[in-house]
Amino acid sequence: MKKAGLLFLVMIVIAVVAAGIGYWKLTGEESDTLRKIVLEECLPNQQQNQNPSPCAEVKPNAGYVVLKDLNGPLQYLLMPTYRINGTESPLLTDPSTPNFFWLAWQARDFMSKKYGQPVPDRAVSLAINSRTGHTQNHFHIHISCIRPDVREQLDKNLANISSRWLPLPGGLRGHEYLARRVTESELVQRSPFMMLAEEVPEAREHMGSYGLAMVRQSDNSFVLLATQRNLLTLNRASAEEIQDHECEILR
């Protein structure tokens, strides 16, 4: 029994080290691709030629761009027009920073335009990965379809999700998640990053270890989903795992 336990521990350590090495390999020049697209292509083209290309939209005064992602037919990314690395940035808990999740929700219309018909709100999800859960250094929120199994699980737990951050029964995709119900008026007034930092104990000091997602519920409220990095359980806090970029839910 002792040997079996030791072997299990060794396997966990190897997995953790491998995850760390994988992350380290992805922090080179390629990790700046999105930032270069925003700062060196989309923003200058909009300012000089009133053309957002290669982005779908550039809003310099509002501080964001929307870019069609190469992965998936309907996936878009919302990104700032200035340097923000990710969930670890203290700018995200600054009240003067744009409410990027609310802006990303407004940008879901790009999915419908691309699809050629309205994409139901229940099929849409927003997600941002933790510091170790993403491969790009520039802050970006994924706007994409939700996985059908995640949609079903959230529907079943509708009555269990309250206005406080509480563990979601059963978690999602094999990982633990906190869930919080949010009304549209709350979302307009206050960033989900601030809700997480101010309401979850010790979250403010470890924001970079969290992935965050948002989905609309059948009662027109929203549910915020937060997962924290835990390499011992092989959770890199990649909240994007709740999404399906091939959009099976629309078929």
Swiss-Prot record:
The keyword Hydrolase applies. Disulfide bonds: none annotated. GO terms for molecular function: CDP-diacylglycerol diphosphatase activity. Pathway: Phospholipid metabolism; CDP-diacylglycerol degradation; phosphatidate from CDP-diacylglycerol: step 1/1. Pfam families: CDH. It is a single-pass membrane protein. This is CDP-diacylglycerol pyrophosphatase.
